[in-house]
């Protein structure tokens, strides 16, 4: 595994805001979301390919499966959230790319484990056979374990000032702990076949998927402004944004499990209902859930409005989620 920027890395010393230059803005000076999102996703994928490579003896089946889990599709939303928060200041692009890659490794870890027969038992992910289907269940378990380790190793190896690597590791660890994704998944499994209140589902979603969204934003901000009491108001705004945006993404996912097809989802539709899993969509109904998602996205935008143009990229990710919802779950 190669870590950090190399002497030949042409990103070194270039900020996330400066790496695209004028091409990222239209004639009006407005930042073009399709340009920076495509470029950001490409840079993170290049970092993943660099970080997840065999060093000496060729590619093992485990490494091949790890690359399969991380390099074949995905919207890269969490990495883009990190990059967008990193754009709050002139953060070195190479640092954000590697942090974004670490986040995507951890996200892939959670997906690989969630898809296992003992968990959600899914056979499709991102339009391809899930890791346990293609490589076997034992390898899939090891893939998740190894991706988690590589994510932390990537952060610990960053060429970053002060205690930044420690703070980043702490944020990511907290996101997947018993108070985060792992705890949320445990609750999700425990609710199968039960009638529960909406508040219980919302709390579960905030842990299972929302915690990693929050960490993605906070990790980008840590790269931009560090750990400083002077930025308490900034982190408060970002946490509110993350809470609303992360929950909105999961509500949209609940809706699309009902309304979208395999091509749009990249996974098997109707799985939640078939497994008797309570969701926001099943409890609220599709139209109420849709409005709930729209309200959450609006609240996310209001949370970062005081940050002004610095938060332009975070706002554009809200717009992308809105467009995705309108495309795949139009109003009845």
From Swiss-Prot:
Superkingdom in the source lineage: Bacteria
InterPro entries: Isoprenoid_synthase_dom_sf, Polyprenyl_synt, Polyprenyl_synt_CS
Single Gene Ontology MF annotation: metal ion binding
Compartments it resides in: Cytoplasm
Keywords: Cytoplasm, Isoprene biosynthesis, Magnesium, Metal-binding, Transferase
CDD domains: Trans_IPPS_HT (cd00685)
Annotated binding of isopentenyl diphosphate, by residue: 75, 78, 107, 126
GO cellular component, one term: cytoplasm
Reactions catalysed: isopentenyl diphosphate + (2E)-geranyl diphosphate = (2E,6E)-farnesyl diphosphate + diphosphate
Cofactors (names): Mg(2+)
GO BP annotations, alphabetical order: isoprenoid biosynthetic process
Cofactor remark: Binds 2 Mg(2+) ions per subunit.
EC number(s) stated in the UniProt entry for this protein: 2.5.1.10
Positions that bind Mg(2+) 2: 114, 120
Amino acids binding (2E)-geranyl diphosphate: 125, 208-209, 250, 267
Top class in the EC scheme: transferase
Binding positions (Mg(2+) 1): 114, 120
Family indicated by similarity: Belongs to the FPP/GGPP synthase family.
Protein name (record): Probable farnesyl diphosphate synthase
Species name: Bradyrhizobium diazoefficiens (strain JCM 10833 / BCRC 13528 / IAM 13628 / NBRC 14792 / USDA 110)
